[in-house]
Amino acid sequence: MNEPHLLIDAGNSRIKWALADAQRTLVETGAFGHTRDGGADPDWSTLPRPRGAWISNVAGADVAARLDTLLDARWPGLPRTTIRSRHTQCGVTNGYTTPDQLGSDRWAGLIGAHAAFPGEHLLIATFGTATTLEALRADGRFTGGLIAPGWALMMRALGTHTAQLPTLTTDIASGLLAGAQAEPFQVDTPRSLSAGCLYAQAGLIERAWRDLADAWQAPVRLVLAGGAADDVARALTLPHTRHDALILSGLALIAAEAAAATAAQA
């Protein structure tokens, strides 16, 4: 069968989707909001009927219901699978003590990263509502991770829980720092808040990378993904690689493995 797979990554802030062909190449991509208030529905009108939909959803039941409504409106009865983290899948072994507690987005991202950088030790930093770090050995063993507030959440927390600090978005903060990246210390409150929270992100990444390289006594590639990756990258002093399709690529691998298993049983 050559029908494509529809891949859906429902994150905490928005929903990304892609159509993957038989070679797992992402041939169509897009994004939309959790609700119609967050933007237009995806335009799937010109897409061929996929073999099925493979979904990572960390956004909850309301988003799951919205996805079902959208899928049924375009392709009634389309098979769909919402993935869960496993102990082992697509060459990656889950080091969590309770494997299914690992977020499905992080699991798919690990699978995508292992395939994208074969034979390399990796530290994967993803910048969304939360900043997550995953330590992935070259043999596919996920040995653990870290979760911290994302850049936007840090700034929003300070603005919300203090009387005199502003509440800044990442767009505002990025603009404020555009001409001040060379200066480690800022001379007004909005820029000080923006830079302080950004440096907190960069400091976390650099400390984690150094600790991991020391523990493993081997080179570790730092991989950055997510909406704030460009801003955090400018504050880093480490070499790094950008990859923005790890989750969708991982979903493509999961879908392909399942299709191969089904074909083998036929």
Curated annotation (Swiss-Prot):
Coiled-coil region: none
One Pfam family, short name: Pan_kinase
Cited function: Catalyzes the phosphorylation of pantothenate (Pan), the first step in CoA biosynthesis.
Pathway: Cofactor biosynthesis; coenzyme A biosynthesis; CoA from (R)-pantothenate: step 1/5
Enzyme Commission number: 2.7.1.33
Sorted UniProt keywords: ATP-binding, Coenzyme A biosynthesis, Cytoplasm, Kinase, Nucleotide-binding, Potassium, Transferase
Alphabetized PANTHER family for the sequence: TYPE III PANTOTHENATE KINASE (PTHR34265:SF1)
Annotated catalysed reactions: (R)-pantothenate + ATP = (R)-4'-phosphopantothenate + ADP + H(+)
Binding site for ATP: 9-16, 129
Binding positions for substrate per the UniProt entry: 96, 103-106, 189
Subcellular localization: Cytoplasm
Source organism per UniProt: Burkholderia lata (strain ATCC 17760 / DSM 23089 / LMG 22485 / NCIMB 9086 / R18194 / 383)
Keyword Transferase (UniProt): yes
Subunit relationships: Homodimer.
Cofactor binding remark: A monovalent cation. Ammonium or potassium.
GO CC list: cytoplasm
Active site (catalytic residues): 105 (proton acceptor)
Listed cofactors: NH4(+); K(+)
Residues that span the membrane, as ranges: none
Designated name of the protein: Type III pantothenate kinase
GO MF terms held by the record: ATP binding; pantothenate kinase activity
Any one GO biological process: coenzyme A biosynthetic process
CDD domains: ASKHA_NBD_PanK-III
InterPro entries: ATPase_NBD (IPR043129), Type_III_PanK (IPR004619)
Family classification: Belongs to the type III pantothenate kinase family.
Top-rank taxon, per record: Bacteria
Lineage of the species this protein comes from: Bacteria, Pseudomonadati, Pseudomonadota, Betaproteobacteria, Burkholderiales
